[in-house]
């Protein structure tokens, strides 16, 4: 069974499954650093995406350029976890390492709220 971690954005908590079979090094580095507390930064220029600074680097694995809603990727050069709360047609490749499977609606709500109002606190934990 896939490993699950929690993603708390503002007042909403979602469940993410880790894609350990496709991005084992990235998943391992995330798990080693849990819990992570950070701040949401909305990627207004890119669309329905927000970013979270994370305290690790990992080489590219499972590269993805088209992002579906619920995808969670690592943009390694900037130590940024990218959370796509709706689909984004095209962008530079990043490591797809997790998928939101529980309470995507809550994450979408917080993402849209951050679009208008600014950042929100973020926690990632087991």
Residue ranges, per PLM feature:
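A short beta-strand micro-motif
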Residues: 3-10, 73
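A short, compositionally biased
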Residues: 1-4, 68
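Glycine-rich active-site loops that engage anionic ligands at enzyme catalytic sites
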Residues: 18-126
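Glycine-centered tight beta-turn/hairpin loop motif at sheet-sheet or coil-to-beta transitions
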Residues: 9-13, 78
């Amino acid at each position: 069974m896939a490993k699950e971690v929690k993603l708390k954005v503002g007042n909403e908590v979602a469940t993410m499954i880790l894609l350990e079979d496709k991005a084992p090094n990235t998943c391992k580095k995330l798990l080693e650093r849990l819990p992570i507390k950070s701040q949401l930064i909305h990627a207004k220029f890119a669309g329905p995406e927000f970013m979270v600074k994370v305290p690790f680097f990992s080489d590219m694995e499972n590269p993805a350029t088209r992002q579906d809603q619920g995808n969670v990727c690592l943009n390694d050069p900037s130590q940024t976890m990218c959370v796509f709360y709706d689909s984004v047609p095209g962008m530079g490749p990043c490591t797809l390492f997790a998928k939101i499977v529980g309470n995507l609606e809550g994450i979408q709500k917080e993402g849209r709220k951050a679009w208008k109002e600014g950042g929100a606190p973020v926690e990632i934990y087991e």
